[in-house]
Amino acid sequence: MQISEESKERLVKVFNIGKTVTHYGWIPLILWLGYTQSNPKPQLMRVINPLA
């Protein structure tokens, strides 16, 4: 089964978008999960800047 050129281009575009979203969203996701799942909740400024 062969994939058409148009389908290949769409797949490449989707993978590139997914790669970009993962690249820029990974650390904010981890920070958000840590902030929402911790008990007691730290002050938001301490999460963003530990020296504050």
Curated annotation (Swiss-Prot):
Residues 37-52 are mitochondrial intermembrane. Coiled coil: none annotated. The keyword Transmembrane applies. The keyword Mitochondrion applies. Pfam families: Tom7. GO terms for molecular function: ATP hydrolysis activity; structural molecule activity. It is found in: Mitochondrion outer membrane. It is a single-pass membrane protein. The chain crosses the membrane at residues 20-36. Residues 1-19 are cytoplasmic. GO terms for biological process: protein import into mitochondrial matrix; protein insertion into mitochondrial inner membrane; protein insertion into mitochondrial outer membrane. It comes from the Eukaryota. Keywords: Membrane, Mitochondrion, Mitochondrion outer membrane, Protein transport, Transmembrane, Transmembrane helix, Transport. GO terms for cellular component: endoplasmic reticulum; mitochondrial outer membrane; mitochondrial outer membrane translocase complex. Disulfide bonds: none annotated. Its main location: mitochondrion. Forms part of the preprotein translocase complex of the outer mitochondrial membrane (TOM complex) which consists of at least 8 different proteins (tom5, tom6, tom7, tom20, tom22, tom37, tom40 and tom70). Belongs to the Tom7 family. This is Mitochondrial import receptor subunit tom7.
